Regions:
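Flexible helical/loop "lid" subdomain adjacent to adenine-nucleotide binding pockets
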Residues: 39, 49, 167-171, 175-204, ...
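ATP-dependent adenylation/nucleotidyltransferase module used to activate substrates
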Residues: 2-175, 179-186, 204-218, 290
Length: 296
């Protein structure tokens, strides 16, 4: 089969569009998609410093690679930041991969750990939880977001970029819907209009399967060992359900994503909560005490 953009042999076919592409044209299409998302939501401005959250997985390393290429032709800088949760036998491999890749790209690299920020590792925090229904992913997510905020403030960054893809958004929407947490539905936009540090998701309109193929076709290293806590919640089941739907009805993920963004915009004002200052640590929150302090 021939690439529809050039005369080379096609190696990838997008079922939802019927488009067959060679390796180079496929990679260029991913770069264009990310650039279009960044432009559409005005994610990065001139002279800004972007902290790129890099876990060592495929999404974050693809994001780092793309933003590095863009920073060479656009006026912004990037710093890679990895958060060490303190999961025995898991995080060490990722740290090695990220450090080596950042050295290859000539990107500044920093690490921050839960232990140094909160005086507990993720494993230790799980022993402190009052309710077993509170999953490790919930705790880790709260800690990770605060850690990235801390890193961005310390480094003087304007923006935090994470590697969340289209599939992640669909899964999160369904998790919040099924758990009755409608307040979080209003914050699904991949961009941010915050006057403080902005949170952006440049890969938010790209399928997870395409990010995997981009990583392989560009020989990007990434950690394949899954987090030992990944199956505690229902995300894995939802991922499999959505993949099954996509296999039977090509393009259904794209349709659902567009609907979610529209719903999120409608829900944004309804979900709005005035920001307060945590009486314990001084960070912004929506209650008297922030989620991090409530946990530790």
């Amino acid at each position: 089969m021939q690439c529809q953009k050039c005369e080379n042999i096609a190696v990838y076919t997008r079922k939802y569009s019927g488009e067959s592409l060679c390796s180079e044209c496929f990679s260029n299409s991913i770069l264009r998609k990310a650039a279009k998302t960044i432009s559409k939501y005005k994610m990065i401005k001139n002279d800004e410093l972007v902290v790129v959250g890099v876990s060592g997985g495929k999404d974050s390393l693809v994001l780092l690679s793309i933003l590095k290429k863009m920073s060479e032709t656009h006026n912004f800088k990037i710093i890679a930041v990895t958060i060490d949760e303190g999961i025995p036998g898991y995080r060490d491999e990722a740290l090695g991969i990220v450090k080596s890749f950042c050295s290859k790209l000539d990107v500044e690299f920093r690490t921050y750990s839960y232990k140094e920020l909160y005086d507990v590792t993720l494993s230790e925090s799980l022993e402190l939880r009052e309710d077993e229904k509170t999953t490790s992913c919930s705790i880790c997510g709260i800690f990770r977001r605060r850690a990235l905020d801390h890193a961005a403030k310390e480094l003087g960054a304007n923006v935090i970029a994470t590697g969340h893809n289209l599939d992640d958004s669909l899964q999160t929407f369904l998790i919040n819907t099924l758990s009755g947490d409608s307040n979080k539905i209003g914050w699904m936009s991949p961009g941010s209009d915050s006057k403080q540090i902005r949170k952006i998701k440049p890969l938010a309109e790209i399928y997870e399967s395409e990010i995997v193929f981009y990583a392989f076709t560009n020989d990007l290293p990434f950690q394949t060992e899954p987090c030992p806590h990944m199956n505690e919640g229902i995300r894995t089941e939802i991922r499999e359900f959505l993949n099954s739907l996509e296999n039977q009805h090509s393009g259904i993920k794209n349709n659902m994503y567009r609907s979610i963004i529209k719903i999120s915009e409608v829900m944004k004002d309804v979900s709005f909560k005035e920001k307060r200052i945590c009486s314990n640590c001084g960070n912004q929150c929506t209650g008297k005490i922030c989620a991090v302090c409530n946990m530790i």
